[in-house]
Amino acid sequence: YLTFYPFDFAPGFWQQLANSIKNGQVAILDVVKAEILRGNDELKSWMNQLEIGKYIDHRAAPILQRYGEVLQHIQKNPVYKVAALTEWSRETVADPWLIAIAVSYNYTIITFEESNTGLSSRTPSKNAKIPDVAQTFGVKTEKLYYMMRELGLKLG
């Protein structure tokens, strides 16, 4: 967030995003909230003040099933090293949960992550990327500006 919209530079962005979260247009995943709250910065303060209209508990049955499928995909896919599975298997890592939820509820994931265009079984990667794994499950990923346009968020 500091790269694109620091709080002191774009307070209107954060207020509009808070409104979209309050009215349920943007869902908040408990694992993502927990990740943010582990920090000690303005984003943590902002998160603590939010009214969340659509809060998703990652332990819901359909999500747990999809989560297992996501991890199984990484485990069985020869383009990934064991390190990719080890990283994504940590419960505090939000990436596989985001994909599991997006599959379960037909959501779009907003991320700055880029696909790994060099994935190959000859040179497996230790890092799974959201866009690559999401695509396997038919989940759409988009950038922040897509979301801003969809929600009608304006700067200035």
Regions found by a protein language model. Give the residues of each.
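Active-site-proximal, substrate-binding regions of enzyme catalytic domains
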Residues: Y1-Y107, S115-L119, Q135
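Acidic, PIN/NYN-like endoribonuclease modules and their adjacent C-terminal/linker elements
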Residues: L2, S115-G156
